[in-house]
């Protein structure tokens, strides 16, 4: 749904003292996000920006994205939007808003069909290297990026809590109890390798082709990372596992290029990566069973089969 024109006009008015001459331009994303609505704008000098408008209920998503952009701005070699201005519009049509710099490029997802296998594999390897670079920002505890959010002191406590929440939801959405028990045992059996995580880092939590930018034409190289509203402090291999699950859907053979590009080292790290991928697949299965998009039964069956095979 597009941003209400009256709301958009009011938000632009609030930003104009900081960004003189700001107006809507013709740029628009190929696909809108599930939470925030994105609008292209320019200032009086023609400099391009992106305005993201969030529902009032998503204030934490806004604050998380602002903080994550600032943290990522300290990491060399990664192009990400920088926050320019943000705030909250109260009243009957309350929204949050974030004005950020605009990056060049298009979504990898928009070019995927045009890329040959060799280029796709090379890009996947680069994605692994870039994600490793993002993980240079370290935190203190596992959980919410914002200081007032829920956090846990150890990797194992974080994973154990997540496993409990996900398996309970799995049962509520019709998942077989025998498979839920297998998943719990699988995670418990890998407690030692999970606990070996050296510490939490900044995790994107959606480092996939819809949030990674490449040039619109020519050689596909990673030129931008966007959509940081889900960022958190977590095990870096949890972040990589989510990306690997996504790569597996498109080109299963490229999962090796991804993990090699990232630099997964030794059997312990590979096992830890497997645990996190199982949990991500379980979370996705739960969401599909609850939301029921087109073809949901087939998707649920495929994910149940994957979970059974991996545990």
Predicted regions and their residues:
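An alpha-helical support segment within catalytic cores of ATP-dependent transferases
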Residues: 4-23, 88-92, 98, 104, ...
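Charged catalytic carboxylate motif
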Residues: 7, 64, 126, 130, ...
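Short secondary-structure junctions
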Residues: 15-24, 76-79, 266
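ATP-binding pocket architecture of kinase catalytic cores
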Residues: 25-154
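Helix-rich C-terminal or lid/interface subdomains of diverse kinases
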Residues: 30, 59, 125, 161-165, ...
């Amino acid at each position: 749904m597009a941003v209400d024109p009256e709301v958009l006009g009011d938000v632009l008015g609030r930003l104009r003292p900081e960004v003189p001459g700001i107006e809507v331009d013709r740029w628009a994303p190929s696909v809108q996000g599930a939470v925030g609505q994105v609008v292209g704008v320019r200032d009086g000098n023609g400099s391009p920006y992106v305005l993201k408008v969030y529902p009032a209920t998503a204030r934490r998503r806004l604050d998380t994205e602002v903080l994550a952009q600032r943290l990522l701005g300290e990491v060399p070699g990664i192009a990400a939007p920088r926050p320019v201005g943000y705030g909250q519009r109260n009243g009957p049509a309350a929204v949050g808003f974030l004005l950020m710099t605009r990056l060049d490029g298009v979504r990898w997802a928009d070019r995927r069909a045009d890329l040959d296998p060799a280029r796709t594999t090379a890009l996947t390897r680069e994605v692994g290297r870039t994600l490793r670079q993002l993980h240079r920002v370290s935190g203190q505890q596992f959980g919410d990026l914002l200081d007032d959010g829920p956090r846990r002191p150890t990797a194992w406590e974080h994973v154990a809590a997540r496993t409990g929440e996900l398996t309970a939801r799995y049962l509520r959405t019709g998942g077989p109890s025998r498979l839920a028990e297998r998943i719990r045992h699988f995670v418990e059996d890998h407690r030692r390798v999970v606990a070996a995580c050296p510490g939490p880092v900044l995790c994107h939590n959606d480092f996939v082709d819809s949030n990674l930018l490449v040039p619109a034409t020519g050689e596909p190289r990673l030129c931008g990372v966007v959509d940081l509203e889900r960022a958190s402090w977590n095990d870096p291999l949890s972040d990589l596992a989510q990306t690997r699950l996504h790569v597996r859907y498109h080109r299963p053979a490229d999962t090796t290029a991804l993990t090699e590009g990232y630099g997964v080292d030794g059997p312990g790290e590979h096992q830890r990566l497997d645990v996190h991928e199982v949990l991500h697949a379980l979370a996705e299965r739960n969401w599909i069973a609850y939301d029921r998009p087109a073809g949901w039964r087939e998707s649920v069956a495929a994910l149940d089969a994957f979970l059974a095979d991996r545990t």
